[in-house]
Amino acid sequence: MDIKYVPTICPYCGVGCGMNLVVKDEKVVGVEPWKRHPVNEGKLCPKGNFCYEIIHREDRLTTPLIKENGEFREATWDEAYDLIASKLGAYDPNEIGFFCCARSPNENIYVNQKFARIVVGTHNIDHCARLCHGPTVAGLAASFGSGAMTNSYASFEDADLIFSIGANSLEAHPLVGRKLMRAKMNGAYFIVADPRYTPTAKQADQYIPFKTGTDVALMNAMMNVIISEGLEDKEFIEKRTKNYEELKEVVSKYTPEMAEEITQVPADVIRDIAIKYAKADKAAIVYSLGITEHSHGVDNVMQTANLAMLTGNIGRLGTGVNPLRGQNNVQGACDMGALPTDYPGYRKVADQEVMEDVTCTWGCSDLGCEPGLKIPEMIDAAAKGDLKVLYITGEDPVISDPDTHHVEEALNNLDFFVVQDIFMTDTAEFADVVLPAACWAEQEGTFTNGERRVQLIRKAVDAPGESKYDWEIFCDLAKKMGADPEMFTYESAQDIFEEVRTVTPQYAGMNRERLDRPEALHWPCPSEDHPGTAMMHIEKFAHPDGLGIFMPLEEQGPMETPDDEYPLILTTTRLLFHYHAAMTRRAATLDREVPTGYVEINTEDAAELGIANKEKVKVKSRRGEIEIAARVTDDIVKGIVNIPMHFRECSANILTNAAAIDPKSGMPEYKACAVAISKMEGSK
């Protein structure tokens, strides 16, 4: 019996837990957490523990598929390549779009965006950060000059106070949740603000329920109190920031009493948490999708930055603004330039000098300076007939994007559609060509977690059938389409990473030898003698002048508000046992724990509607309706209902609003849309 242990990184959330894949007879039969790994320290959440169950499933894609007369047939790689190459070459580049995969290693994503830009000639490149932490990238870049988490996870344990807003870490990021609980055990005061009384909120020293979508008003009122009480860090503000007087003027009108009317948080409670946050020597802000997934998500993110700068809680252990990122490599996907506005390393597409530098490095011709379309814009353009061809790698927008009917309409309206994935997803069913890809356990490369830690993943087993690495597929297609072979010839993922270092300044000092250790390296790491950067903005911010920028912001509220026809606000969330659906619902152990969805409804709302616990109800919005079981609970604010987003048979995204978009980031408003709930016909 031949058993080996292959160290790698979990493929689910952005925490980046280390694990060993247990391989027996060339199959992955289990996982063991790394005991020495600095992130998870010998622990894993349920998703990590059972991630191996999807690797050898019989429904893995193993050969290219081409749709003819509405049915898929098996095809050779050459057939598939010829068809794809002919279609990509037949349309104007502006009529073609790419969704990159934030689950995929950095090396795959880098080659994907390079192929789209050089070979196809389009900046219509995006990935799922648009639907989770796009506002983080835009908001923190505007405030601090860098759109990423400021501190490391380990830093939480040095905090005196932790303010968690819009983050249910014990379910969505359990091993970060563990560090927060350890901080609390060390004496940190733990405040949780959330419309739902989540498992994380139940561990708080102080829980603040508030009306979804009113984060700006809540934090403006907190800053009003801090300034009124003279608790702002005057020295930090003077030496390290600008635009303070403009901020002060705006927040002056947001008294706690005014904010109470907006947020439903009592004025005395707002005063209390503001003073506690300001008086703490080291206070950390933690947030996640409850902050970002709004039509004013960038404003929410910039408010967290305002609050931290106002009190000098930046650049020290136990402080900072700490977004908990979504997918395992969503940070890396942003770093690699899977964005319509940015090349690798966040260098701007619109900057002529940047474009000239990139073309010189890559050895290609003019790439143009017009930014491309974001994911919601590509979906809209496809629905209108302006986007003709779409190439999706490892994304499932039929499940994950808002307004499912709109997404399906858009996909049906395409002239040509390619999906590259490991399973026949709900989205892949719409495709003209489906290509089989290797999963994370079947390849080498790097993932970058939410704290900017770049970590190696290692191949444990061969990919099934004729599956290929994503980077290999794009290189094959590039050559098929006549690209210079030297631009797309790599022997390994390591070769690609060496090129990444030349175009991504934050990664310049990293090499395999330095990454081949449990602690790996945090970016920015500009040279090989640089130790990496676990904590950012210690002496200056990343703006050219080194100053942080206060952003005065007014409360906007959700774009869609309740009315007589749709009197409730729907928010959507994630569960401990699921991620999206394509993988976790195929992991038998996880799917058995929560096999289908439900709608959480406040006890008073349920009583007014005559709805009993577990009763099947109809939930309706302006975009569609679903049938789903009710879960009657006191753990959610009256007037708000919640549906987990994982379940196709009762999909929350049939209800969500694709038209409610954050103008600063393109983020759809998953956390607030108006719905009505009614009893099913014939129910008692």
UniProtKB/Swiss-Prot annotation:
InterPro entries associated with the record: Asp_de-COase-like_dom_sf (IPR009010), CT_Formate-Dh_H (IPR041925), Formate_Dh-H_N (IPR041924), Formate_DH_asu (IPR006478), MoPterin_dinucl-bd_dom (IPR006657), Mopterin_OxRdtase (IPR006656), Mopterin_OxRdtase_4Fe-4S_dom (IPR006963), Mopterin_OxRdtase_prok_CS (IPR006655)
Protein name, per record: F420-dependent formate dehydrogenase subunit alpha
The organism's place on the tree of life at top rank: Archaea
All copies of domain 4Fe-4S Mo/W bis-MGD-type, residue ranges: 3-59
Protein's gene: fdhA
Entry-linked Pfam families: Molybdop_Fe4S4, Molybdopterin, Molydop_binding
Cofactor note: Binds 1 [4Fe-4S] cluster. Binds 1 molybdenum-bis(molybdopterin guanine dinucleotide) (Mo-bis-MGD) cofactor per subunit.
Catalyzed reaction equations: oxidized coenzyme F420-(gamma-L-Glu)(n) + formate + 2 H(+) = reduced coenzyme F420-(gamma-L-Glu)(n) + CO2
Reported temperature dependence: Optimum temperature is 55 degrees Celsius.
Family as reported in the entry's similarity comment: Belongs to the prokaryotic molybdopterin-containing oxidoreductase family.
pH dependence: Optimum pH is 7.9 (when assayed with coenzyme F420).
NCBIfam families in alphabetical order: Fdh-alpha
